[in-house]
Curated annotation (Swiss-Prot):
Required for maturation of ribosomal RNAs and formation of the large ribosomal subunit. Belongs to the WD repeat BOP1/ERB1 family. It comes from Drosophila persimilis. Residues 1-160 are annotated as: Disordered. This is Ribosome biogenesis protein BOP1 homolog.
Length: 785
């Protein structure tokens, strides 16, 4: 078992010559001390590259050896006997240390120039017990009170052990070494301790506060007292050099008094004391000019200037017009020149510049909006210049040109050179946003007139459509087969399948009647349950209002209609344009644009009663919509959209569309975003939590947009227009309210045919799959997958 022994070395100051040497340094112990120090190197020699780092001595002795040496490391004497016991050795060592300390203090008082004594304890570890007493020394830590190179002539450049130069040292973070020494050998990084080691060093090491890390070698350097004093002086804002005297007496190396001395000391000439002849001639000329009246005095010149100038009048309140006049004088802006005539204005233009019938018809159609025309005139062709008549709009164009020159303000604008690609928002690729419909898969044919509306069963197996041929057809989606056809007495404007999967009901708006139809498809138990629900009318204790009785009447279907599947008929006093269901399937709303203040009605299926939510009409109602989550009701007029709270019966918000005519709207399944279609070729995306104005206006179609629809599961929405196109777009709504919705147009599906200026009339999504259905004026229903 190894034992760590400690060798203590004390630096003892030289004693005065008149004092005798210590009594305990006898000649008997000199031989033993010399044998002990045979393997010990001179402490003045630097055996390692690390300054100030304590190292251990390996010895096989079982004793603590203590000896004394001078500043240069010469051996002076040994303290204590080798054969004494551990306790006696410790006591004798302590007594000798006290005596040495007293001697050191005494000598420091007598001689201030001598170095102070310091004691260092160096621990030694023994790995295996051996018979030899060989001791390997390590250079002790440097005394902080002394300058590092006070006793040597070593320069700073020679002390630089790391030769990598002035580079960032973090380049060596991934390597085990930190650079190269003068012999081109790697300098290995010192071992790094953890936080516990740092904490123990902070407690045990008294010099921890003055220890810094050298970034070049990674070693820890102990700051001297001079270094600390220098740092303190710099922090306190004083001059770093203590020997510099700030208030030394001023030495005038050069005098501050100006001494004037002549360049040449030549005596004045004799003619310098006589009057100048040239000045005499000049004065005589001026006198002659005054006598002849050619020359005037200063007073006469000032008087003539005052008479010419006349009286001055100043404006008390200066206006902006005067400043503008001065600006026009000093910085005029020339009038813009008219554009040179092009090929279209020629009397014999090329054929491609002449209008065809379609372009001429469109040009005449924009008579009320001439600013939207491509050209302000219609190009004409003549055989010769003699046949060209007088230009009928010449005087008007000259008059408008004069108005532009006279009334239009002129200003210089700095043209910004902005790259067009910088203005285009960066959108993800459509390939990354799949799935979405890309091709036409099925065409459902069977109607003989316009197909106005389409709706899908909640489970996604069947499809219902309504047409102007006064029929309602139920289709099987997978095969395209028409299962049932229900004939009505009037044009079918709208159909809507009940969103509640526990009921099998279709609401059909035909003329002024609302038919509740059981399609008799799907689960037989579900069909029977629906018939039982609609068979008997519930008994109502509440007396209905006269306004409601005159507006709507509930009745069971006749036997002939019962065979077709019609169960309940709700008769309105005006033609119905739209019908929509609440998410739970118990309420449905109808819109009658000609109904004035009774245009919108809400019907409750379970109690067979109706309500008129509004007492006053604030516009021509186009369509209505239920909120999917909250008890809110959306009412769209021609120009605006109002949101009402059905519980509090008050207006919540009014959305400003800035459009001429609203055609339809659809709400996002989460209920925070609304999509509106208009007849003026626009789609408006409203963020209900953000503002009452559109978050984004999309102009994707060339003609009126008839219908829009959100998908219930996927971040998709579609729009149908009279340009026979169905445009599918990606509309991602994030849960983070601080992140705006992502809108990306994906695919344009254009397979419908145009009939009498009509194209796609309605679009609807499959409830489960990313499929979209569209109805058109070509009497077909098309499925895109």
């Amino acid at each position: 078992m190894t034992k760590k022994l400690t060798i203590k070395r004390k630096v003892k100051e030289p004693e005065p010559q008149n004092e005798a040497p210590d009594s305990h340094e006898s000649s008997d112990n000199e031989e033993e001390e010399e044998d002990l120090l045979q393997a010990v190197k001179d402490p003045g020699e630097d055996s390692t590259d690390d300054e100030g780092i304590d190292q251990e001595y390996q010895t096989d002795s079982s004793e603590d050896l203590e000896f004394e040496s001078d500043e240069e490391g010469n051996y002076l004497g040994r303290k204590g006997a080798e054969g004494s016991s551990g306790d006696d050795d410790e006591e004798s060592a302590e007594d000798e240390e006290e005596e040495d300390d007293a001697d050191a203090k005494k000598s420091s008082k007598n001689n201030d120039e001598e170095a102070a004594t310091t004691s260092k304890s160096i621990k030694k570890s023994q790995e295996k017990p051996t018979s030899s007493n060989k001791v390997v020394p390590v250079v002790p830590a440097r005394d902080p009170s002394k300058v590092e190179y006070a006793d040597s002539d070593t320069s700073d450049e020679e002390d630089i052990r790391n030769t990598v130069g002035n580079i960032p040292m973090h380049w060596y973070d991934e390597y085990k070494h930190i650079g190269y020494d003068w012999d081109a050998k790697k300098i290995v990084k010192p071992p790094k301790g953890d936080q516990i080691d740092d904490f123990l060093r902070k407690i045990e090491d008294p010099n921890f506060w003055r220890t810094v890390k050298d970034p070049l070698t990674g070693q820890e350097v102990l700051l001297t007292d001079a270094d600390i004093a220098l740092i303190k002086r710099i922090n306190s804002g004083r001059i770093p050099n203590e020997e510099h005297d700030e208030y030394a007496p001023w030495i005038e190396w050069f005098t501050s008094e100006v001494e004037k001395m002549p360049i040449k000391n030549v005596p004045d000439h004799k003619r310098s004391f006589l009057p100048s002849g040239s000045e005499k001639k000049t004065v005589s000329r001026m006198v002659h000019a005054l006598k002849m009246g050619w020359m005037k005095t200063t007073e006469e010149v000032q008087r003539e200037k005052q008479e010419k100038r006349g009286p001055k009048f100043y404006m008390l309140w200066e206006t902006d017009t005067s400043r503008e006049q001065m600006r026009r004088i000093h910085d005029p802006v020339s009038a813009p020149k008219r554009d040179l005539p092009g090929h279209a204005e020629s009397y014999n233009p090329p054929p491609e510049y002449l209008f065809d019938e379609k372009e001429a018809k469109e040009w005449h159609k924009l008579k009320d909006e001439p600013h939207r025309r491509k050209l302000h005139f219609m190009p004409q062709k003549f055989k010769s210049l003699r046949e060209v008549p007088a230009y009928s709009r010449y005087l008007r164009e000259r008059f408008l040109r004069c108005l532009d020159l006279y009334l239009c303000p002129r200003a210089k604008r700095v043209k910004l050179n902005i790259d067009a690609e910088y203005l285009i928002p960066k959108l993800p690729s459509p390939r990354d946003l799949q799935p979405f419909p890309t091709v036409e898969s099925l065409v459902y044919r069977g109607h003989t007139d316009l197909v106005r509306s389409v709706s899908v069963e909640p489970k996604g197996e069947y499809l219902v459509s309504g047409s102007d041929d006064k029929t309602v057809k139920i289709w099987e989606i997978a095969t395209g087969r028409c299962i049932r056809t229900i004939e009505t007495e009037d044009v079918v404007r709208c159909v809507a399948w009940c969103p509640n999967a526990k009921l099998s009901i279709i609401a059909v708006a035909t003329g002024s009647r609302l038919l509740l139809v059981n399609p008799k498809v799907g689960d037989k138990l579900l069909v029977k349950k629906t018939d039982d629900l609609l068979a008997e009318a519930p008994v109502l204790d509440v007396i209905e209002n006269e306004r409601i009785k005159t507006a709507v009447q509930w009745a069971n279907a006749e036997p002939a209609d019962q065979e077709k599947g019609v169960r309940v008929i709700i008769t309105h006093f005006k033609p119905i344009r739209q019908v929509t269901w609440h998410g739970r399937g118990d309420y449905l709303a109808t819109v009658m644009p000609e109904g004035a203040n009774r245009s919108a009605l809400i019907h409750q299926l379970s109690k067979r009663r109706s309500q008129i939510p509004f007492s006053k009409s604030k516009g021509l109602i186009q369509c209505v919509l239920f909120h999917p989550v909250k008890p809110c009701f959306f009412v769209a007029t021609q120009h605006n959209i109002r949101i009402y709270d059905l519980v509090k019966q008050e207006l919540i918000k009014k959305l400003l569309t800035n459009s001429k005519w609203i055609s339809g709207m659809s709400i996002h399944p989460k209920g925070d975003n609304l999509l509106v279609s208009t007849y003026d070729k626009k789609m408006l995306w409203f963020d209900l939590d953000l503002s009452t104005k559109p978050y984004q206006t999309m102009r994707l179609h060339r003609n009126a947009v008839r219908s829009v629809a959100f998908h219930l599961r996927y971040p998709l929405f579609a729009s149908g227009s009279d340009d026979q196109a169905v445009i599918v777009s990606h509309g991602m709504v994030y849960n983070d309210l601080l992140q705006n919705p992502l809108i990306v147009p994906l695919k344009k599906l254009q397979t419908h045919e145009k009939r009498e200026e009509f194209g796609v009339l309605d679009v609807n999504w499959h409830p489960v799959q990313p499929w979209v259905f569209s109805t058109g004026a070509d009497c077909t229903i098309r499925l895109f997958t």
